[in-house]
């Protein structure tokens, strides 16, 4: 009953998001998800409950893109799953289905152009479903709801908890111990945190490689020394690797389990991200006959200090944009009133 008391007028998630209003049976309202299911020969109205206990979550906890760059109210999101659920398969969808008009990227999809490296970029949303589906639990048929909405009893009735949160919030880890009954809560918590710690540390490594790659491309674009005959092609290769490397990093960063939904996939994706970012650096170095190499030596946090504070409001302040070397590539935004605070509308 938490939903009935905590959902505000501005919150778009309610009972009807997952339940038929008359029967309270699970049902899908997401047209993009239904489109995908139909494309693989499944009837959204005739799926088993075991599958529905994850698909209702996949209505939102997924990666998606809009099928029109206008992103207007008549446009609709598309789930990029036609080639599979891996980062590589999703990336292949973004190799077309867009309107980028830049040498080497014509017709590709991009969410924005990075102001520093001038690279058409991809922003992952929250690919929880795509990460979980071929992980240990997903492959074993464990549904999202089994862990995040475990059964409980209220007044003698069995029902699913609607406190949507991490199972780690429960000191007893009862959701986990429904299956892992032979393990203590302390042991299970330790295994989860071990995976998350390894993933997070690798995420930070991949992040630094990505920043260095953007900086390498920036330096190569502004390089005025002697350049090789294939300079333009090397710049395209560098940008392509920056774009893909950051997307792979973001696939793990934007996902909510810090690797736990699929430890092998998370670490493999981050390894690929690091390799791609290094490929970008190598291409940028070649494009300048290694003339920029001295400027890329050392701790990347010293070369490009971490941006610890940034917001739309701060970008409206020209003086603040003087506080970081990368901010020089941003245009000050026009003054505007703040409309939202988190998920609460304030005006």
Language-model region placement:
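Primarily the internal scaffold of c-type cytochrome electron-transfer domains
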Residues: 2-146, 150-336
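Extended, compositionally biased alpha-helical segments that mediate assembly or anchoring
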Residues: 338-347
């Amino acid at each position: 009953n938490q939903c009935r008391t905590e959902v505000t007028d501005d919150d778009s998630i309610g009972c009807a998001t997952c339940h038929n209003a008359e029967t309270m049976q699970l049902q899908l309202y997401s047209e993009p998800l239904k489109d995908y299911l139909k494309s693989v020969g499944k009837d959204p109205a005739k799926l088993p409950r075991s599958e529905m206990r994850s698909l209702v979550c996949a209505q939102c906890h997924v990666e998606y893109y809009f099928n029109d760059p206008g992103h207007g109210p008549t446009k609709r999101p598309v789930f990029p799953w036609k080639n599979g659920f891996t980062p590589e398969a999703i990336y292949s969808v973004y190799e077309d289905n867009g309107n980028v008009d830049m040498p080497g990227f014509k017709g590709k999809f991009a969410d924005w152009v990075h102001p520093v490296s001038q690279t058409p970029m991809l922003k992952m949303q929250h690919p929880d479903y795509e990460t979980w589906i071929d992980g240990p639990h997903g492959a074993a048929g464990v549904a999202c709801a089994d862990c995040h909405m475990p059964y409980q009893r209220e007044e003698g009735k069995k029902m699913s908890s609607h406190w949507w949160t991490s199972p780690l919030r429960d000191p007893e880890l009862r959701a986990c111990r429904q299956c892992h009954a032979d393990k203590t809560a302390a042991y299970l918590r330790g295994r989860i945190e071990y995976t998350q710690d390894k993933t997070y540390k690798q995420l930070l490594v991949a992040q630094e490689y990505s920043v260095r790659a953007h900086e390498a491309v920036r330096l190569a674009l502004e390089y005025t020394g002697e350049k090789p005959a294939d300079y333009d092609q090397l710049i395209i290769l560098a940008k392509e690797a920056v774009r893909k490397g950051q997307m792979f990093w973001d696939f793990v960063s934007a996902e909510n389990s810090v690797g736990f939904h699929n430890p092998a996939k998370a670490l493999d994706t981050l390894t690929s991200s690091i390799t791609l970012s290094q490929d970008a650096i190598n291409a940028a170095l070649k494009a300048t006959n290694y003339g920029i190499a001295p400027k890329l030596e050392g701790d990347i946090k010293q070369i490009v200090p971490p941006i610890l504070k940034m917001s739309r409001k701060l970008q409206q302040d020209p003086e603040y944009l003087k506080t970081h070397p990368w901010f020089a590539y941003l245009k000050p935004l026009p003054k505007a009133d703040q409309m939202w605070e988190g998920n609460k509308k304030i005006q």
